[in-house]
Amino acid sequence: MAVARSKLLVVEDNRETQLIIKVALRDSYDLQVVNNSNDAISLLLNNSFDLVLLDLNLDGKDEGKTILSKIRDEMKNTKVPVIIATAYDLKPEDEQFYHENANGFIPKPFNKKDLLGIVNKVLLKK
């Protein structure tokens, strides 16, 4: 009997970064990739995921915080692990929120090894 592959939602608006993520993770995980907060929230409301890889800055806005808040407060799967991917330093006023609500962080740019490492680590803790 085949082992089910973990299902990951990737929320990333940069096409180049999407490609890096797909190449790094597609052999090990089932990926659903979206590039905006509306699609992410819709998928999260109607599907179950084993992990969310979330870009904080979507279309030049801090949409990641909104998505993470909705995951933790409103979704049926509020315990889904979330890894924050960002090229920016966290705002001091947001640091505590992210540390309390995210399960991991990966700075951009990242490589395949680092991305696989954090995803595997967070999924093993699940």
Regions found by a protein language model. Name each.
Residues 55-57:
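Active-site residues of response regulator receiver
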Residues 66, 89-104, 117:
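Alpha4 helix (beta4-alpha4-beta5 surface) of REC/receiver domains from two-component response regulators
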